[in-house]
Amino acid sequence: MSRFLRGLTILWVVFRYGLDELVLSSFEHPWMRRARAVLTLGRRLDKPRGQRLREALEELGPIFVKFGQVLSTRSDLMPPDVAEELARLQDRVPPFDSQIAVDTIERAFRKKLDQIFVSFEREPVASASIAQVHFAVISDRNGVQRDVAVKVLRPGMKTVIDKDLALMHMMARWVERLSADGKRLKPRQVVAEFDNYLHDELDLIREASNAAQLRRNMEGLDLVLIPEVYWDFCRSDVMVMQRMTGVPISQVERLREAGVDIPKLARDGVTIFFTQVFRDGFFHADMHPGNIMVSLEPETFGRYISLDFGIVGTLTEYDKEYLAQNFTAFFRRDYKRVAELHIESGWVPPSTRVDELEAAIRAVCEPYFDRPLAEISLGMVLMRLFQTSRRFQVEIQPQLVLLQKTLLNIEGLGRQLDPNLDLWSTAKPFLEKWMLDQMGPQRLWRELLAEAPRYAKLIPELPRLIHRRLTRNSGEHDELLKELLQQQKLTNRLLQAIVSAGIGFVIALILLQLVVRLRWY
């Protein structure tokens, strides 16, 4: 019954904000046009469609707000005006009663609160639709007291989420059947991704693992601080991390008055992001100003502080190659190569003509070169490429769309700090190093080192293996003996050839690296 009532509520909100008109407008049958005219009679639909959708999602509650936030990252699927409006959605939810948070913690640990924490602040410092945060003090396994932040899941969230998701899945099926744009927008796929995303957020162990991975990756980079996870105090619905203190990055004047080098801070943000992308293939994908502070402590002055690790992105070597080659081809204005990269990726239907895709990409990219290099937005370039690709039914991978959205956030943040930030100059060394690593001797050397133990063990055992085989089948396999002995001779010759040619091969690889550097432009 409750699901039925919730469904009626959703339908009423959809009707009141004119969102049904967006679906019905896809139909061209005369009777559907008449139905649309009747249904929209007397309603004010003067607001832009994106604004109406945003306001409807806000009225439907936090789960739908989160859904809108996820949709805003799918610039490959959503029209630009709708994606831009959905990006304005804010996860504003009042905190739940602190006693409920205490009960959740005690239930998770099966202990009283004073047996878990040295002290616990009952007043939450932050709240969102999924969880809220309290400050506390713990005593670690060495007896050292630590200031921590405790994230506690809202109770009953799984039940609420499952009910709304069931309705979303049902609506997605209907939209895909009834709307002419349904198959292109892939509502069932989008809702399925959102389903996975929300259930991942319900497991705080996963978020803690993301934080631990980023902290480990960033240890050698003195530009960013990632809070330490205290695993002894983590459960699926409670996460305890190091308490971080700093100034929100949006408070630029306060940072400037404190002596922070603002232009350097802008460059450092880009450096952090591209290090995570091209070196680690694992990046913080929720780097908006609310999740970033700047340290003013003497030993870590001017460093970024990253918070909230519920959303991360992972990239394969193929994804990184796609990005690096697309960016370099774009700045060379080699639009044919950009089109070829899309086709080589296998995301484009086989019937796509390269010249047509090239012409469409040229129309998108060429206007960017009328402005200074420092004003070119790599995030916008990717977004426009994805939007152009949509016309050709290109299947863009979700992780690349997530990266594009994060890149836009990084660029916006960087240029808010320093309007003269040249993103390309900062990004270029990372692209160049990655390309050289892929084409130069470093990659070959890494692969040789990876395979060396296996071959080092196999080669000395070859005579023994031959002898064992022959003694088991004495007199029966003369031809096999000849073949194995011949193979051993060939192996010895091959090893000698590798050793004798090694120096020349290394020299050739060094020359190749120099050629790659010269061809960068």
From Swiss-Prot:
By its UniProt entry, which PANTHER family does this protein fall under?
CHAPERONE-ACTIVITY OF BC1 COMPLEX CABC1 -RELATED, PROTEIN ACTIVITY OF BC1 COMPLEX KINASE 7, CHLOROPLASTIC
Molecular function terms from GO: ATP binding; protein kinase activity
Under which pathway is this protein filed?
A: Cofactor biosynthesis; ubiquinone biosynthesis [regulation]
Q: Record keywords: ATP-binding included?
A: yes
Question: Where on this chain does ATP bind?
Answer: V125, A126, S127, A128, S129, I130, A131, Q132, V133, K151
Its organism's taxonomic lineage begins at: Bacteria, Pseudomonadati, Pseudomonadota, Betaproteobacteria, Burkholderiales
Q: What is its EC number?
A: 2.7.-.-
Keywords, comma-separated and alphabetical: ATP-binding, Cell inner membrane, Cell membrane, Kinase, Membrane, Nucleotide-binding, Transferase, Transmembrane, Transmembrane helix, Ubiquinone biosynthesis
Q: Name one GO biological process term.
A: ubiquinone biosynthetic process
What this chain does, per the record? Is probably a protein kinase regulator of UbiI activity which is involved in aerobic coenzyme Q (ubiquinone) biosynthesis.
Q: Which InterPro entries match?
A: ABC1_dom, Kinase-like_dom_sf, UbiB, UbiB_bact, UbiB_kinase
The protein's name in its UniProt record: Probable protein kinase UbiB
Any idea which residues are catalytic in this one? D286 (proton acceptor)
Q: Which family does it belong to?
A: Belongs to the ABC1 family. UbiB subfamily.
- Tell me which GO cellular component terms the UniProt record holds: plasma membrane
Where is each Protein kinase domain found? 119-497
| Compartments (UniProt record) | Cell inner membrane
